[in-house]
Amino acid sequence: MREGIHPEYNHDVVVKCACGNTFTTGSTNKELKVEICSKCHPFFTGKQKIVDAGGRVDKFMKKFNLSNEDVK
């Protein structure tokens, strides 16, 4: 690798989340600010909501008031 063209790597970079959580990592930046982390993300906290949007066929059936028995 060529010398003098790569950014300086910092081993102790503080990552600050909007929820107040902080942790350290390595990066070429001196400080990182993130909006969401593993302490506040719904997937990791277990507070996620499952949304069943349904498919295009279900939307069509609902639009024309059909049921599975009506269609062969």
UniProtKB/Swiss-Prot annotation:
Keywords: Metal-binding, Ribonucleoprotein, Ribosomal protein, RNA-binding, rRNA-binding, Zinc. Part of the 50S ribosomal subunit. Its cofactor is Zn(2+). SUPFAM superfamilies: L28p-like (SSF143800). GO terms for molecular function: metal ion binding; rRNA binding; structural constituent of ribosome. It comes from Clostridium botulinum (strain Hall / ATCC 3502 / NCTC 13319 / Type A). Binds the 23S rRNA. InterPro entries: Ribosomal_bL28/bL31-like_sf (IPR034704), Ribosomal_bL31 (IPR002150), Ribosomal_bL31_A (IPR027491), Ribosomal_bL31_sf (IPR042105). The lineage of its organism: Bacteria, Bacillati, Bacillota, Clostridia, Eubacteriales. PROSITE patterns: RIBOSOMAL_L31. Zn(2+) binds at C17, C19, C37, C40. Binds 1 zinc ion per subunit. One of its GO terms (biological process) is translation. Belongs to the bacterial ribosomal protein bL31 family. Type A subfamily. GO terms for cellular component: ribonucleoprotein complex; ribosome. This is Large ribosomal subunit protein bL31.
